[in-house]
């Protein structure tokens, strides 16, 4: 395995953060912890239900890690929506992360998908059955146009995960395949549309801005994720079907060339995101900017992405990019580094165990143990 291109990664990250004028001021520390715990607590109770436990069949440690990661993403990024909306979105996106980590073949359970859908029957695929049950709780926050985007994008995501089951990075010469798959499993339209709850935005009045935001967010969100995930995925055998690796296969280019391609597209998208909305409705621009800054903070602070390892590696280096990266990292940590023990309690497994005893109050006590570690 070749060495990770640390200097290139530092330069790319710094340019990205400079382009979006990174300065996360979305919350006070108290507000952040309050929102984290509210969203987590509701979502934890949801996944501790017997039906969810029986149908998902997810390892408790993995489910706990997935939930903590997603709650962080939603609370940090969807800073303008209500706590109730944050909680419902956290549940929805946790379902998507659970599916993304699954290795089950969906084919048998999807044979009668449309017939069951048309007849109003419960889906044979357990993931679809549970997601469909929760969807009304999500869609109640949004108007019909945004809701349609959430539904359609979730269906695309399922198809993208299905494709990934084959660990297929594309055929050489199939230049459209990498972006096709990334758009399919990126949830860009779902994310872009879920920024505009009807209690804050009239989707008819802001239709043009919302439509443009969905279009722009589709690429920006997934490309930033791919860049910020590049370090953790670099030598992980489970993450070899990534956009960068698929560029290498399909475009028949080197890894450095593929990373440069992603870098240029991400930076261009970031410039567009800022420029397009600069003179639009201030509330729209504020929502987008808060999302971008919170999304970056989440990546820098969530242990899943291991960017603290980069920070420790380069904090004593004297290069300009190393200094800038460390300054940005410390800036993010000052606002976003919150230990899970301060908000991620009770654990889902504990809730599930005590539910039958009717002693849910006991499970509400903070836990200062394994939840400190997020996969």
UniProtKB/Swiss-Prot annotation:
Biological process (GO), any one: sesquiterpenoid biosynthetic process
Keyword Nucleus: no
GO MF, one annotated term: trichodiene synthase activity
InterPro entries membership: Isoprenoid_synthase_dom_sf, TRI5_ascomyc, Trichodiene_synth
EC numbers, comma separated: 4.2.3.6
Pfam families: TRI5
Pathway(s) per entry: Sesquiterpene biosynthesis; trichothecene biosynthesis
Miscellaneous information on this protein: Trichothecenes are sesquiterpenoid toxins that act by inhibiting protein biosynthesis.
Family, as annotated: Belongs to the trichodiene synthase family.
Record's protein name: Trichodiene synthase
Lineage, broadest ranks: Eukaryota, Fungi, Dikarya, Ascomycota, Pezizomycotina
Gene: TRI5
């Amino acid at each position: 395995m070749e060495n990770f291109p640390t200097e290139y990664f530092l330069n790319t990250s710094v340019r990205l953060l400079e382009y979006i004028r990174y300065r996360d001021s979305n919350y006070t520390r108290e507000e952040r912890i309050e929102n984290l715990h509210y969203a987590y607590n509701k979502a934890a109770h949801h996944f501790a239900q017997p039906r969810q436990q029986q149908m998902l069949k997810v390892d408790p440690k993995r489910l706990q890690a997935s939930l903590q990661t997603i709650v962080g993403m939603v609370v940090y990024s969807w800073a303008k929506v209500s706590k109730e909306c944050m909680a419902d979105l956290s549940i929805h996106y946790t379902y998507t992360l659970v599916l993304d980590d699954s290795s089950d073949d969906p084919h048998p359970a999807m044979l009668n998908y449309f017939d069951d859908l048309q007849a109003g029957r419960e889906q044979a695929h357990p993931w679809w059955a549970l997601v469909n049950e929760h969807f009304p709780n999500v869609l109640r926050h949004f108007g019909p146009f945004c809701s349609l985007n959430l539904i359609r994008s979730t269906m695309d995501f399922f198809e993208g995960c299905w494709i990934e089951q084959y660990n297929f990075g594309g055929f050489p010469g199939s230049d459209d395949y990498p972006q096709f798959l990334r758009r399919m499993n990126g949830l860009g339209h779902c994310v872009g549309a879920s920024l505009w709850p009807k209690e804050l935005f009239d989707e008819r009045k802001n239709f043009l801005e919302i439509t443009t935001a969905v279009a722009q967010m589709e690429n920006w969100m997934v490309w930033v994720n791919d860049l910020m995930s590049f370090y953790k995925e670099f030598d992980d055998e489970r993450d070899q079907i990534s956009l960068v690796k698929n560029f290498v296969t399909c475009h028949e280019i080197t890894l450095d060339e593929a990373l440069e391609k992603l870098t240029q597209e991400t930076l261009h998208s970031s410039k567009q995101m800022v420029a397009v909305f600069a003179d639009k409705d201030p509330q729209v621009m504020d929502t987008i900017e808060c999302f971008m800054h919170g999304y970056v903070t989440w990546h820098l602070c969530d242990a899943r992405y291991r960017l603290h390892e980069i920070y420790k590696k380069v904090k004593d280096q004297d290069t300009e990019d190393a200094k800038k990266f460390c300054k940005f990292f410390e800036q993010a940590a000052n606002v976003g580094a919150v230990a899970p023990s301060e908000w991620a309690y009770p654990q889902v497994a504990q809730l599930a165990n005590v539910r039958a005893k009717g002693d849910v109050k006991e499970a509400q006590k903070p836990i200062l143990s394994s939840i400190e570690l997020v996969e």
